[in-house]
């Protein structure tokens, strides 16, 4: 804990509010809320914590706080701050969590379409459905039963679907509004499970077709009836009142939380949502934060009712979710929440079981690798790779694997300082010397194994630096790739030789992951440096454009091409004066003309 934090801790008020933890770059890494800011924020820097909280605390170099009038206001503010800043230690909902809906458009001739986006007053929506396959299957069934218009734009002749009896062909079909109202009502009844009348009608048509010896048509009606029956069986009835509701349950263990949501539509369970994440505060508070984020996503349909567990404050939920909040006390409804909670517990236990299995596999892999190389178990492995294009913007990267898993906080990037031109050996020599002279000088943790991406030459360079120049006794290995740029050979020993490694062994998969990861990290860093260099060279020597403004442009636009495409107003919106904007645009134009001239 630094002096700044010590001083700020003394000034914290006994009030509700939000706090924002920051790292050494000033980036917000965690947002939390508290009924008492003084107690909550101080708790991070006192006493012992579990591993994940220790990791969070180790990165905190500053914090801010915002006082609110109430706990409810703090919760709302927390949700907004998380959405705005996306701190890396906060709950992150899974990407692409929008579900498909069926929609009847409100056009003059309505169409039945599938969409993942809900727009107010834009039509009738049914769903959500668990996935696009299910939504498409239901739509196919509806298309065969109800003749909605299929064509988006007006045409002057009937379409293919009209001949199949699946389109009204608006050029000749009913323009009577009452007709469409009846059709839409029929769809509503059908999707609400009131399909007996439709089945009876289809059965009558099937029998009539059979009597007329029109067996193909009769078979079509039979298949439609079968499709409706199949759709019925796929939906489990969870309540008899046919209400739309979301049912929440959660379970916590070992510093992790699992939230389970059952989506119930017209009394039927159509889908569940599962999310697992580490939590850092009180479980009930983090659950509330999750709910707030969940419904702040505009693609999440808000049902008429939401069931929540007994431990959760109804008033706080009501403040963030604009619908009826129910905390069931008894009977079937309470059992539904219990079922969601039970499923959350099972999902969390499955995660722990899989983690344990993975740990055993990984532990076995590094143990076997150590035995294969006749070295101590390589608990910590550091791997290196260079990246450049014809010697331009040369960089290198180091990734660290601890207990067989990436330790990203230990990753390091290196800009090559002493090498001119494309010389991978000299670049590797520089990077390894810089890294391990510092390890030796500062007493940093040394790895059990160093891996370089390359063949005999790279390994010999690495051994020369480690053993001869620095006098260290750290084993060095090399990973060679084949013509397809895939991990192929492990080089080790004195003299160097290819180590026989079964291609389907866990040890091989571990080395493959390490090589891929260090290559990815090096290439990503090289792209960043190259882009920044290109960016800087173009924008150098522009009066009024200093390092801070250049950094601002880089963060916002990413590339020179993006700046060239931007309007003056868009660039000025970043706080850059009009005269400087004009100079930037002129410089980009001049550079473009220079490149195009002979």
Curated annotation (Swiss-Prot):
PROSITE patterns: GIY_YIG (PS50164), UVR (PS50151), UVRC (PS50165). GO terms for biological process: nucleotide-excision repair; SOS response. It comes from the Bacteria. InterPro entries: GIY-YIG_endonuc (IPR000305), GIY-YIG_endonuc_sf (IPR035901), GIY-YIG_UvrC_Cho (IPR047296), RuvA_2-like (IPR010994), UVR_dom (IPR001943), UVR_dom_sf (IPR036876), UvrABC_protein_C (IPR050066), UvrC (IPR004791). One of its GO terms (molecular function) is DNA binding. Residues 196-231 form the UVR domain. Residues 14-91 form the GIY-YIG domain. Keywords: Cytoplasm, DNA damage, DNA excision, DNA repair, Excision nuclease, SOS response. The UvrABC repair system catalyzes the recognition and processing of DNA lesions. UvrC both incises the 5' and 3' sides of the lesion. The N-terminal half is responsible for the 3' incision and the C-terminal half is responsible for the 5' incision. NCBIfam families: uvrC. This is UvrABC system protein C. It comes from Streptococcus pyogenes serotype M6 (strain ATCC BAA-946 / MGAS10394). The gene is uvrC.
């Amino acid at each position: 804990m630094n002096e700044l934090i010590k001083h700020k801790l003394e000034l914290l008020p006994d009030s509700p509010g939000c706090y924002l933890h920051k790292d050494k770059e000033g980036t917000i890494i965690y947002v939390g809320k508290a009924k008492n800011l003084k107690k909550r924020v101080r708790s991070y820097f006192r006493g012992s914590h579990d591993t994940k909280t220790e990791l969070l605390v180790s990165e905190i170099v500053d914090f801010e706080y915002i006082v609110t009038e109430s706990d409810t206001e703090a919760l709302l503010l927390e949700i907004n701050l998380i959405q705005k800043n996306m701190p890396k230690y906060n709950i992150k909902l899974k990407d692409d969590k929008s579900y498909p809906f069926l929609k009847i458009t409100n056009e003059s001739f309505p169409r039945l379409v599938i969409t993942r986006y809900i727009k107010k007053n834009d039509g009738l929506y049914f769903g959500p459905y668990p996935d696009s396959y299910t939504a498409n299957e239901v739509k196919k069934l509806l298309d065969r039963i109800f003749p909605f218009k299929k064509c988006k734009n007006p045409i002057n002749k009937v379409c293919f679907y009209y001949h199949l009896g699946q389109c009204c062909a608006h050029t000749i079909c009913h323009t009577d509004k009452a007709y469409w109202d009846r059709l839409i009502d029929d769809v509503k009844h059908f999707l609400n499970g009131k399909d007996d009348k439709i089945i009876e009608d289809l059965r009558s048509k099937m029998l009539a077709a059979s009597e007329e010896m029109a067996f193909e048509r009769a078979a079509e009606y039979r298949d439609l009836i079968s499709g409706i029956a199949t759709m019925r069986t796929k939906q489990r009835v969870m309540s008899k009142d046919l209400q739309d509701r979301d049912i929440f349950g959660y379970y916590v263990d070992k510093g992790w939380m699992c939230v389970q949501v059952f989506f119930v539509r017209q009394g039927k369970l159509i889908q569940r949502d599962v999310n697992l994440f580490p939590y850092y505060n009180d479980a009930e508070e983090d659950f509330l934060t999750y709910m707030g984020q969940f419904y702040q996503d505009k693609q999440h349909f808000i049902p008429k009712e939401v069931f929540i567990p007994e431990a959760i404050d109804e008033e706080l939920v009501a403040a963030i979710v604009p619908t009826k909040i129910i905390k069931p006390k008894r009977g079937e409804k309470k059992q539904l929440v219990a079922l969601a909670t039970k499923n959350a517990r099972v999902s969390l236990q499955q995660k722990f079981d899989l983690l344990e299995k993975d740990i055993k596999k990984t532990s076995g892999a590094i143990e076997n690798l150590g035995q294969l190389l006749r070295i101590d178990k390589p608990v910590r492995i550091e791997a290196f790779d260079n990246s450049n294009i014809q010697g331009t913007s040369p960089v290198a990267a180091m990734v660290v694997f601890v207990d067989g898993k990436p330790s990203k906080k230990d990753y390091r990037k290196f800009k090559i300082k002493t090498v001119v031109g494309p010389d991978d050996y000299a670049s590797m020599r520089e990077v390894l010397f810089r890294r391990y002279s510092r390890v030796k000088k500062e007493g940093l943790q040394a790895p059990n194994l160093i891996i370089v991406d390359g063949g005999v030459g790279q390994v010999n360079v690495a051994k020369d630096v480690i053993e001869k120049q620095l006098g260290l006794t750290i084993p060095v290995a090399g990973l060679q790739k084949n013509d397809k740029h895939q991990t192929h050979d492990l080089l080790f020993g004195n003299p160097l030789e290819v180590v026989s490694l079964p291609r389907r062994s866990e040890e091989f998969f571990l080395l493959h992951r390490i090589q891929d990861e260090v290559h990815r990290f090096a290439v990503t860093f090289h792209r960043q440096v190259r882009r920044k260099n290109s960016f800087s060279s173009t924008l150098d020597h522009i009066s009024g454009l200093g390092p801070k403004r250049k950094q601002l442009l880089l963060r916002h636009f990413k590339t020179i091409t993006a700046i060239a495409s931007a309007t003056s107003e868009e660039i000025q919106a970043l706080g850059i004066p009009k005269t400087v904007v004009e100079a930037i645009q002129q410089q980009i134009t001049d550079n473009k003309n220079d490149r195009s001239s002979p």
